[in-house]
Structure formats: structure tokens, C-alpha cells
Amino acid sequence: MNYFSNNINYIFLLIIIFSNLSFGKEFDQLFKINHKIESGQNIDTSLNRSFDDMIYRLSGSTKPSNVWKIINAGNARKDFITKYSIKNISGTSYIFTEFNQTLLEQTFFDLNIPIIGKSRPVYMIMLEVDDGLNSPYFVSETSSNNLDRLLQSQISELASKRGVFIVLPSFDLKDSENILSYNYLVEPEKYLESKYDYDQLISIKVIKTGINEWKVAGGLEAMLGSKNFNRDFLNVFFNMLDREVSTSLNLKTISYESNNNFSLKIANINSVNDYEKIKDLLFGIIGLNNIKINKFSNNTLFCEINFYGKLGSLLQEIDENSYLNLLNTSDLEEDISIEYKL
């Protein structure tokens, strides 16, 4: 493919995901993996696992077959790494690895492995817990019960591994009281819609129905015992969530069989820095095969691009970028007008 010529631990990632939905659904750290170094694990093993996670992210599938397809084609994992560093955070060692986007895309193309762009779904988790003893409550990003802390940590891990956004609401006491009040006329789902932007809401209610029994209803149906409730609930919850993520990502696959040319007009470029930033942004669009600059006039860049995938995939990548504002497309859907957001 021809283009323009030329950290964080899980808790920190959790803060980023929860505190800034203004970035839309563009997963701009897609090619950077942070991996916890387990006790007794050497650097090479950690790098290999980081590579595997990178392939899972980019393909949208957690099946190891894509990893082995790449390795069996004569590629070494280390060839895809541009740099890595090791950091100690609160007594825990992490390896931060950055991967070569261009080489990965070319390899996926050569081996016909499905690829997912940076446009990633946002999941809102609304989980109500009623243990029959205390007042019912909604698990939020700040709630601190044992189950809540386990959920927060594992949600962050899953979001990082799959390259998606998984959000718990930020409810204060008034929010919870409003939602749980029988006199509150707005359904909880409507209340969330008024406060958050997301692609899919997963609403679950967990109720203790007996001394040794819990009922899980809504987006997940299950009957669980009390003895190992936290473990069993987390198991069925994350199995369900992982399936939902796989289904959503599968719908975002960029097809190599569809190869299209489009004209781009990018306005509001007022400096050399703006121009360089635009180049980097276009360079980062997954599925872009070639870019030809035609002219620059009146603070507007005119170029031709070749893109693997349908127009809808390209428009999603543009529309969900923090620095690009999609203005319109022509009637024939061959001309795309964009504005650079300062």
C-alpha cells in the first residue's frame, strides 16, 4: 500500500475511556498495546502476547487462527514492532508496545485477513444490583463495592484488548435517586440517552431472590447461586459482552474486494502545521490504499484517494475523527467535503 511518505495502565485507560466521550468512537490508540508483565514472564513472551492482542484488535476476532496465519506466512512478531518500553506503575510492571500500522495493513491485505478500522462501537452498561438488604443501586464508574471494583477493572481490560469503548455511567446520588424513584416519569434508558452518546445499551438487573439464589435479567438471563456469585456473574457477564463486541466488530469489517476512488476537499487548513496534521490524519485511516494531492488553494486541500471498503466505512472513519468535520458528499457519492477542526 502506498501512503504519504514519510502509558498507561488499565486504570489510567479506564479514566480515559470514561472521562472523554467527546472523542466520539475513534479508537486513536489502536496500534499501541499495554500489557501487564506476569510474574516469571520474560520480555519476549510479553511482546508475543502484545502482538497477539494487536491482531485480535485489528481483525475483530479473538480466534488465534489469524495470528498463526501471519506467522506461518514467514513473518516474525518482532518485525511488526516499532518500539517498546517497560514501566513500573504502582509496583506492577507493564510493557508498552507500538506497532507498525502500514506493515500490519499490508500483511492483512496479502493474507486476506478481515480488518477493522478505528471507528469503534461504544457500549453503555447499565447494571442495577438489588441484594434485598440494602437500597438498590446502579454500578457506576465510582461505586466501590467488591463486585463493582472487579467489574471496573475487567471492563477496562476487555475494552483495551478488543479496541472498543465500554462505559459505566457516572451517576451521582441525585441521579440514582431519580432513576430509582417510582415517581420519576422517565425510564432509566431515556435518562441515559439524555446524558450520554453510545451505540448500544446493555441493561441488566441483578436481584437476590432467595438465601442462596440470584436472578439476572434484561440483557443477560441467568440464575446463579450465592456461594460464588461474584465469580459466576463475572464469567457469564463477560462471555456475553465479548460476544456482543465480536458481533458489532464483524459488521465493521473493511472489504478488500471493494476498491473505490473518491475526491476529497478539505477546508480550513491555515498553516503548515495544519497541513502536516491533515496528512497524518489521512495516513491513519485504515483501508486507505493511495493518496494523490491535486492542489492547495484558498486554505483548501484537494486530493484523490483510493480506499478499500465501501463509502459508508470511509465516512464513519472521517465522521468519528476528533479533528475532522464531515460536511457533505455529492449526489454520486464520489466527492467528499471535509473541514479541519482547529
Language-model features: where?
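Bacterial N-terminal signal peptides that target proteins for export
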Residues: 2-11
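N-terminal signal peptide c-region/cleavage motif recognized by signal peptidases
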Residues: 19-21
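Amphipathic beta-strand/beta-sheet edge segments enriched in Tyr/Trp
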Residues: 27-36, 191-239, 336-342
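N-terminal segment of the mature soluble domain
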Residues: 47-73, 121, 125-182, 196, ...
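Signal peptide-directed extracytoplasmic domains
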Residues: 67-129, 136-137
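A short, hydrophobic beta-strand-centered structural micro-motif
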Residues: 78-85, 126, 165-213, 318, ...
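Acidic, glycine-rich low-complexity/disordered segments
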Residues: 133-135, 238-261, 267-268
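C-terminal soluble interaction/assembly domains
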Residues: 224, 260-342
